[in-house]
Amino acid sequence: MVICPIRAISVIRGYTFGCGGAALGNPRLNVKENAQRSTSNVQHRMKRPVHLDEEQVREHLRMEELIPAMEKALIDFSAGKVTQPVRSVITIDPPGGFFGMMPARTPEGLGIKLVTFYPPNAKLGIPTHMATIFLVDPETGAPLAVMDGRLITEMRTAAVSAAATKLLASSDSKILAILGSGVQARSHVEALRLVRQFEEICVWSPTKAHAERFAEEIGAKAMSVEQAVRGADVVVTATSSRTPVLQGAWLKAGCHVNAVGACRPDWRELDDKAMGNVVYVDSREAAMKESGDVILSGRKIYAELGEVLAGKAPPRGNETTIFKSLGMAVEDIAAALLVYRAATKKSGR
């Protein structure tokens, strides 16, 4: 038996020997094996990111689940639980559109949406809005998913309007007016029908043929913009107009308006009289930088929708209300997480 008061280690021909002459192995091989083992462990923890196209997103996103998810996202944002800068925009002129970057850190996720708006695309038969959403693991920064964001943008916008309508519109609302005939108009009909039992839907679009086709699809009536708005309990403006299409003089007392177009500081959908009612927004900061309806009218914002949902401000639903929606990254991340969780659950990842 060899007694080693001080542990002795010697190296002979690349092999390490400790006390008693036991071979401990080649140190170079140990380093290589450890590195390989470490790499394997990292790869096991870092699964390959999920890639989802629009049809896969559609498969996993349900409006019934999206509306409450948007309510929570709005509450979290207004409560200061979300880190989110105002959308960063690069103007693309021509064709008079923009490229936007929308990152957010939420209580449940981290990611960014990249969005483009190209108005001339409408004449080409392709979407005017296109987007991609990138999710990462908040704990490690590892990529989780890359998914198409066009449908998410369309659906989450309508879901937020549904949350506003549920909160602010009369519970016995019967007539819905839709100004516009594009994807947002269609998505809003789907979402708003989940929160109110409308008996009649009136449609207007700048292009009469588009309005008539859309009205036929959803079982509505196509008419002039004034005819559509007068008498309506809920109004949606979902147009690409840069000048007002909705006049406040047409609004029924106590009606609710979801204004979802005009997302630039010099664009408008509503005139000053319409904006003279009780105005709600998704984000005060964003509205004061991006909303021409708010900026150019000079109208004071009453509350963020998340503040009302959280009970921090009364809804004032008995008055004529305007919800100016600009869209926020927190909404995109919340919606993308619904899709990601459903997709990974189905695949067993």
Regions found by a protein language model. Name each.
Residues 1-46:
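Intrinsic disorder/low-complexity segments
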Residues 181-182:
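Glycine-rich Rossmann-fold phosphate-binding loop(s) that bind the pyrophosphate
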Residues 194-218:
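NAD(P)-binding Rossmann-fold cofactor-contacting core
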Residues 54, 58, 264-349:
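Adenosine-phosphate binding glycine-rich loop
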Residues 220-296:
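Rossmann-like adenosine-cofactor binding region
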Residues 46-154, 162, 172, 329-333, ...:
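N-terminal ligand-binding/catalytic initiation module
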